[in-house]
Amino acid sequence: MAPIEILKFPISSPGDISPLKKLQDAGYDPSNILAVVGKTEGNGCVNDFSRTLASAVWEPRIPSDAVTIFSGGTEGVLSPHVTFFLRSPGDKETGLSAAVGHTRRFEPHEIGTDEQAQQVATTTSSLIEQMGVTPDQVHMVLIKCPLLTSEKLETIRALGRVPVTTDTYESMARSRYASAVGIAAAVGEIQHTRIPEAVSKAGTWSAKASCSSGAELEDCHILVLASTSAQGSRLHAVSRPMADAMDAASILALMELAKKDGGKIVQVFAKAEADPSGHVREWRHTMNTDSDIHSTRHARAAVGGLIAGLVSDAEIYVSGGAEGQGPSGGGSLCLVYETSI
């Protein structure tokens, strides 16, 4: 278990590494980095190479056992930034702990399948065990997972295998869902034996899963965030799923918990999706039928604007595509805040 600090900084482009200097100015060394989690100004789709660029410039500059998780798409008021998860100097307790890890690399035909979910469940369970926390203490499992490209589909066909889908964009959703099912098993929301059934049909979801797909990796990068019972905690995490893209009440409820503690919000992590039913509550929406803009981009803009307005901060992590990450049409939500000791 690693007690952690969380710091975030704006970036001027996906290749901007100036936050590293700011991190050092704040008294931290790059060796303290557990994870770099960022929002980059791409389209968040299959051909979003802003994620690839960000990963390429950051990974050589952080410890080999650290992870990068970059989510493309800063639609609306969302502002590009990076959030550092840092080992607390001297392992001083802060109230939050984190662990990071990788699954093995996946063969193209395994992406979006129950094998991916099983590997995520195994790795995540191991991280939770290493941390010495209970699933109830876990507030978020953040994952970057692979997707299918045209080249990978050709490889699958050449091997006589069958891909989970032949649509590269849909593969993002299938990979996110498989990862979310794995998380659900790891935190005890479903039994491990139910993974194949859960992956084969929609409907399973985890309140603690936040998964983002990308072409920049072949494995899953995993970050587990948990609260500890340390006395005099300074950092706190609270979480609950949003019921839909208009669920201000859930955000306000978490903000109220921070307010009661006299806390200052450090970061918000949220998933967003266009309700597949075509309605938000009783109102019809057109996010799923827009031929110009993918629904995930609409959802990021809508939920990003809602949360940013409520917390008065545009440097928040809002990721589109919430398959299995909160109820259908909603999404997982985790708020981190800081109190004075």
Curated annotation (Swiss-Prot):
Catalytic-site annotation from UniProt: K144, S212
Site location (Important for substrate specificity): T296
GO molecular function per UniProt: cyanuric acid amidohydrolase activity; metal ion binding
Catalytic activity entry: cyanurate + H2O = 1-carboxybiuret + H(+)
Keyword annotations: Hydrolase, Magnesium, Metal-binding
Pathway: Xenobiotic degradation; atrazine degradation; biuret from cyanurate: step 1/1
Full protein name: Cyanuric acid amidohydrolase
NCBIfam families assigned: amido_AtzD_TrzD
Claim: Magnesium is one of the keywords in the record: yes
Region (RU A): 1-90
Organism: Sarocladium sp
EC class of the enzyme, as a word: hydrolase
Residues involved in Mg(2+) binding: E273, A322, Q325, G326, P327, G330
The family this protein is said to belong to: Belongs to the cyclic amide hydrolase (CyAH) family.
Regulation: Inhibited by barbituric acid.
Assembly and interaction partners: Homotetramer.
Entry keyword annotation includes S-adenosyl-L-methionine: no
EC number: 3.5.2.15
Top-level division of the source organism's lineage: Eukaryota
RU C, as annotated region: 235-341
HAMAP family for this protein: Cyc_amidohydrol
Stretch list, region RU B: 95-229
